[in-house]
């Protein structure tokens, strides 16, 4: 009986070893080890030039308006070749807009909006916002497990929240800073599109809802302002 038990154990040892072996998702080509379950473009950062569209009469941009964005997108391939994927993520951005809309408040702590004309002498009027972002992309790429250089076309939507806003006016003997504006739409919703090859990728984002739900104090014009961002995005890993 002991001999039969010993033979049974010896026969099954190789099978037990195979069961405990980790699954290898890599393919060896020559001396190169290739990951067949690769993911792409999970960390990103980029720079944008910011425009304000749907401006009422009299509002114009001045100086440089730009932004910085960075974040993480979890890549989930949805086909066997891994050239199609969906990617939800979490990001952060800062955006600055130079323009001639003065944001101030009256004695009752109510917001007021004035369009600055050429008769107003000021050196700076700009608002800056800081956002937490939730992007979601549908991705196509010409990637393979062997190559890091490929074409990509990504389209998606993004929800963002402005957790800090600052409007800063600097004029002759008068500086005004506003951080609490009730008419500000802190929740932002927009569509985005990215395309490019290898390192350089063009990025576009358009906000579907206006920045302010308010009218100008003096002329009673709807402010609106829909940000459009145009820039470059870079991906890592």
Where are these regions (language model features)?
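Residues that define the transmembrane beta-barrel architecture of outer-membrane proteins
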Residues: 39-41, 62-68, 84, 128-134, ...
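Residues on the lipid-exposed face of transmembrane beta-strands in outer-membrane beta-barrel proteins
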Residues: 70-76, 90-92, 132-140, 155-159, ...
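Short glycine/proline- and aromatic-enriched beta-strand/turn motifs that initiate or cap beta-hairpins
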Residues: 18-75, 235-237
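Short loop/turn motifs that connect adjacent beta-strands in outer-membrane beta-barrel proteins
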Residues: 29-41, 77-84, 143-151
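Glycine- and aromatic-enriched membrane insertion/assembly motifs of diderm outer-membrane
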Residues: 42, 51-52, 59-117
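Extracellular/periplasm-exposed beta-strand and loop segments of Gram-negative cell-envelope proteins
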Residues: 56-63, 98-108, 112-129, 162-172, ...
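Predominantly the C-terminal beta-signal and adjacent terminal strand-loop region
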Residues: 32, 38, 180-237
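Transmembrane beta-strands of outer-membrane beta-barrel pores
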Residues: 47-53, 90-98, 140-142, 157-165, ...
């Amino acid at each position: 009986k002991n001999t039969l038990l010993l033979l049974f154990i010896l026969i099954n040892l190789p099978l037990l070893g195979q069961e405990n072996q980790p699954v290898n998702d890599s393919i060896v080509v020559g001396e190169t080890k290739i990951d067949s379950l690769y993911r792409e473009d999970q960390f990103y950062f980029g720079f944008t030039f910011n425009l304000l569209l749907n401006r009422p009469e009299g509002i114009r941009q001045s100086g440089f308006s730009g932004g910085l964005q960075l974040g993480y997108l979890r890549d989930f391939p949805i086909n066997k070749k891994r050239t199609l994927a969906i990617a939800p993520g979490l990001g952060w951005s800062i955006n600055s807009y130079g323009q001639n809309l003065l944001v101030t408040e009256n004695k009752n702590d109510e917001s007021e909006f004035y369009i600055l004309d050429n008769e107003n002498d000021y050196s700076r009027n700009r608002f800056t916002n800081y956002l937490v972002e939730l992007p979601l992309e549908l991705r196509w790429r010409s990637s393979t497990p062997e190559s890091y250089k490929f074409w990509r076309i990504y389209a998606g939507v993004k929800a963002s929240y402005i957790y800090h806003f600052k409007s800063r006016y600097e004029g002759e003997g008068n500086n005004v800073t506003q951080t609490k504006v009730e008419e500000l739409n802190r929740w932002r919703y927009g569509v985005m599109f990215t395309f490019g090859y290898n390192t350089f990728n063009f990025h576009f984002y358009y906000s579907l809802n206006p920045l302010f739900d308010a009218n100008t104090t003096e002329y009673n014009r709807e402010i609106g302002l829909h940000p459009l961002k145009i820039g470059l995005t870079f991906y890592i890993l």
